Amino acid sequence: MNIGNDSPAKFDTVADRLRYYRHRKGLLQREVADCVGIERTTYSSYEEEKRDYYPIDILERIAELYGVKATDVIDDYNLFLLNGQASQVKALRKKTKLTQADFANHVGVTKQQIKGWEQGRARMTKKFWQKVFANQL
């Protein structure tokens, strides 16, 4: 990655933003992992786009190390999770005037899945977030 004079806003993914800030700080992946208390392989997977979801507590520690806010490194999906998935799912369902069963049918999941999302017991995957929310951003 050649960061040159690039702005972090240029990067769309969490992985690219993490890599950008790490390079700006002149740190190795091992150094970041050691500072935030995770395995190097875990941190490496963060920069290799091997995941959609990033634990916010870890991202907050990484962001602090980089001297930025966690919201500077997360993408829209992880921001959705940070801002409270449960309330957002329920608000959208109520806005569309759909029952949980109708909303589930519309989205292609079970009513139990909708309940889990609305109660914060289950995390909505990025695939379903894109289907349900991405077009509204």
Placement of each model-derived feature along the sequence:
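Helix-turn-helix/homeodomain-like alpha-helical modules used for DNA recognition
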Residues: 82-128
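DNA major-groove recognition helix of helix-turn-helix/homeodomain DNA-binding modules
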Residues: 57-72, 125-137
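Short alpha-helical DNA-recognition segment
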Residues: 26-45, 97-113
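The alpha-helix within a helix-turn-helix
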Residues: 22, 33, 63, 93, ...
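A short, Lys/Arg-rich alpha-helix, primarily the initiator
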Residues: 2-24, 75-95
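Recognition helix of helix-turn-helix/homeodomain-like DNA-binding domains
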Residues: 37-53, 78, 109-123
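Residues within the helices of the helix-turn-helix
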Residues: 19, 30, 60, 90-91, ...
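Intrinsically disordered, low-complexity regulatory/linker segments
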Residues: 14, 34, 53-54, 66, ...
